[in-house]
Amino acid sequence: MQFYFSQIGRLFELIAAGKIRALLLYGPDKGYIEKICTYLIKNLNMLQSSIEYEDLNILSLDILLNSPNFFGQKELIKVRSIGNSLDKNLKTILSSDYINFPVFIGEDMNSSGSVKKFFETEEYLAVVACYHDDEAKIERIILGKLAKTNKVISKEAITYLKTHLKGDHALICSEINKLIFFAHDVHEITLNHVLEVISSEITANGSNLAIYFSKKDYSNFLQELDILKKQNINEVLIIRALIRHYLNLYIVLSKVKNGECLEIAIKSLSPPIFYHNINDFTKIVHALSLTECIKTLKLLQQAEVDYKLNPASFDLFQSIL
């Protein structure tokens, strides 16, 4: 069965009741994957072990799943780096009864892969996509944590956080906890509090990256790119941030070409350009031609295709220059 972020509570209930016997977690958000595993270990009083899928054979998996430990506790077994193809012997084992609880962990699972389909279609199995938090999800995390401490947050502060806190789920939660601790003696958290606390490295984001790239400020672009990669943000998300930026430029340049005022054209964008970036965005529009904008969009779209075809040897900077 497929579970989404809003259904995680229900998933935990089904696992605790023994109705879900194995779990597949896939995607680039390692922090969220670890958070789910940690919750299960803590709340269901499990021990844990870990093994790479390629080091596993069917006999050893059968032994791991059916071996009681000395203390009589269930064990959460992390099976890392599972691929897209389902081994028929694995299917047979997971269809039977066993003692321990396996969690299979994959990176980027193919939507048509037999492993993902198997976990989605069987009632006793579950699958959760663990992708980096989008702005709506980040806002829910922020407001949820603040509600527990009876705090509120200004509109400017939450807009800044939604725009800048991109990446690993655990990293986002850590930064919000730091902010709450810093502002322990105030009821309302403001933008000034945020700017004083949130790490400059954490606030690397796609908007800044795109601004640097379109200004041809490659030194800062590479620095920002390195920070994003340290946050476990993969190349596809980075490329799509650049594509969104150039689509905004394309929309504005097209409207200006058709006689619309530049300021009005920029204000028409949805979601809007963050106010800290408006001056830079305006300068880029003045310096960029519509033809060059379209050419860059095509390069970025091809870069995404190239990455998906051969991620191991992909170099983003070389692909889009």
Curated annotation (Swiss-Prot):
One of its GO terms (biological process) is DNA-templated DNA replication. InterPro entries: DNA_pol3_clamp-load_cplx_C, DNA_polIII_delta, P-loop_NTPase. GO terms for molecular function: DNA binding; DNA-directed DNA polymerase activity. Its EC number is 2.7.7.7. GO terms for cellular component: DNA polymerase III complex. It is an enzyme of class 2 (transferase). The keyword Nucleotide-binding does not apply. Coiled coil: none annotated. It catalyses: DNA(n) + a 2'-deoxyribonucleoside 5'-triphosphate = DNA(n+1) + diphosphate. Keywords: DNA replication, DNA-directed DNA polymerase, Nucleotidyltransferase, Transferase. Transmembrane segments: none annotated. Belongs to the DNA polymerase HolA subunit family. Component of the DNA clamp loading complex consisting of tau(3):delta(1):delta'(1). The DNA polymerase III holoenzyme complex contains at least 10 different subunits organized into 3 functionally essential subassemblies: the Pol III core, the beta sliding clamp processivity factor and the clamp-loading complex. The Pol III core (subunits alpha, epsilon and theta) contains the polymerase and the 3'-5' exonuclease proofreading activities. The polymerase is tethered to the template via the dimeric beta sliding clamp processivity factor. Part of the beta sliding clamp loading complex, which hydrolyzes ATP to load the beta clamp onto primed DNA to form the DNA replication pre-initiation complex. DNA polymerase III is a complex, multichain enzyme responsible for most of the replicative synthesis in bacteria. This DNA polymerase also exhibits 3'-5' exonuclease activity. The delta subunit is the wrench that will open the beta subunit dimer. This is Probable DNA polymerase III subunit delta.
